[in-house]
Amino acid sequence: MNIVVLQTDICWADIEANLAKLDSMVDDAPAEAELIVLPEMFSTGFCMDAERVALPDGGEVLSWMRRKAIARSCAITGTVAVSDAGCYFNRMYFVFPDGTYRTYDKRHLFTFGGEDKVYTCGTERVVVKYKEFRFLLQVCYDLRFPVWSRCRGDYDAII
């Protein structure tokens, strides 16, 4: 599988500027890309001001991801600060080339950064099947907890 991992300087808490910057980066990714991986909280930076930056159910950022996945005919994944059912989540979206998506809420919140004081931790382990691979979805600090990521034979790789 051809995977493109994008990294960029974030414009702090500026969704419009970050999407504009990533727009051209996604467009310029190699044509053979089958999966594009974006950074954690790519639209805002690792921002603890969730009241200001969190979007209901992914809002315009999820819409942007879906448009890009469809236009590129490839999957796109990254995390977004979202508000859902009165709580805030650091939510990973895995968007398929047809615009459908799966979600994973970060389980292990980064205490040293105060993430646990603002965001609600996820409770579900999510494995996504894409092409010939099964991906276990995880976000940053989750990797520090091997019991959570232990291979049960249900995935091929961790994103």
Residue ranges, per PLM feature:
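Short secondary-structure boundary/capping elements
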Residues: 17, 57-60, 119-120, 144
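Structural motif
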Residues: 34-35, 135, 157
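Cys-nucleophile CN-hydrolase/nitrilase-fold catalytic domain and related Cys-dependent amidase chemistry
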Residues: 15, 23-97, 102
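Extreme N-terminal starter segment of soluble prokaryotic enzymes
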Residues: 1-5
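Active-site catalytic loop in hydrolytic enzyme cores
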Residues: 83-153
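Short, acidic/polar
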Residues: 17-27, 143-150
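Short polar catalytic/cofactor-binding loops
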Residues: 7-12
